[in-house]
Design a protein with these regions (language model features):
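Helix-to-loop junctions at the C-terminal end of transmembrane segments
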Residues: 55-68, 161
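C-terminal transmembrane helical hairpin of 12-TM major facilitator-type secondary transporters
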Residues: 69-122
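Transmembrane alpha-helical cores of Major Facilitator Superfamily
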Residues: 13, 46-50, 78, 140-148
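Small-residue (Gly/Pro/Ala) motifs that create kinks and tight helix-helix packing interfaces
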Residues: 27, 59, 153-161
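A membrane-interface helix-boundary motif in multi-pass transporters
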Residues: 159-176
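Helix-terminus/helix-capping segments at the ends of transmembrane helices and short amphipathic helices
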Residues: 27, 31, 63, 126-131, ...
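Extracytoplasmic gate region of multi-pass secondary transporters
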Residues: 2-52, 119, 123, 153-154
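Loop-to-transmembrane helix entry/capping segments in MFS-fold secondary transporters
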Residues: 38-39, 132-142
Length: 176
């Protein structure tokens, strides 16, 4: 059980470190890769949290009735990877194409589904993995680890962006 707890904590830090910094850069990526205005990119990306808010209660109810938490975690992580790969590889290749906005919108919808699946299954798994009297400490450790990731990953992203875009000061000129 202890080993599974640490796997859940690792999934938490990796997942949220891939989601929250991505929210910061996604609009700029849409602007750079598809020549969207900031307003259009923001409108399209707003589908992500709205979709997640709409379906998370349904997925929580499904988890309560049917279980399948591990499967939900796997599917959610897989959908996030698909979204990130689409933004990194497909969107730059589709610049100027009618398919670019379609792929972007579809990827963002998938990310919203992912952001519903993972939290709906991850947080309820913690009480199943640790003794009730240690539950507060378990959540504290997970949040502590998560915040280390949220501290480190934006700096890593910034260093990578600076390395692949030497001398470019305008983020709208970034090559993602």
């Amino acid at each position: 059980s202890s080993k599974v707890f640490w796997i859940v904590a690792l999934l938490c830090v990796l997942y949220y470190s891939a989601i929250f910094p991505f929210q910061k850069y996604a609009i700029n990526m849409l602007q750079c890769n598809l020549d969207f205005t900031a307003e259009k990119a923001g409108m399209i990306f707003s589908v992500f949290p709205l979709g997640a808010a709409a379906i998370t209660p349904l997925l929580g109810n499904f988890l309560d009735r049917k279980g399948k938490g591990a499967s939900m975690l796997i599917y959610g992580a897989f959908l996030m990877i698909i979204c990130h790969l689409a933004f990194a590889l497909a969107l730059p290749a589709l610049k100027g194409s009618i398919a670019g906005p379609i792929v972007a919108f579809t990827s963002i919808v998938l990310l919203g589904i992912s952001f519903s699946l993972v939290p709906a299954a991850l947080w309820p798994s913690v009480p199943k993995l640790v003794d009730n009297r240690l539950l507060g400490s378990a959540y504290a450790v997970i949040f502590w680890i998560q915040n280390i990731g949220l501290f480190a990953f934006p700096m890593i992203i910034g260093k990578v962006l600076a390395a692949v875009n030497p001398g470019i000061e305008d983020p709208l000129q970034y090559n993602y």
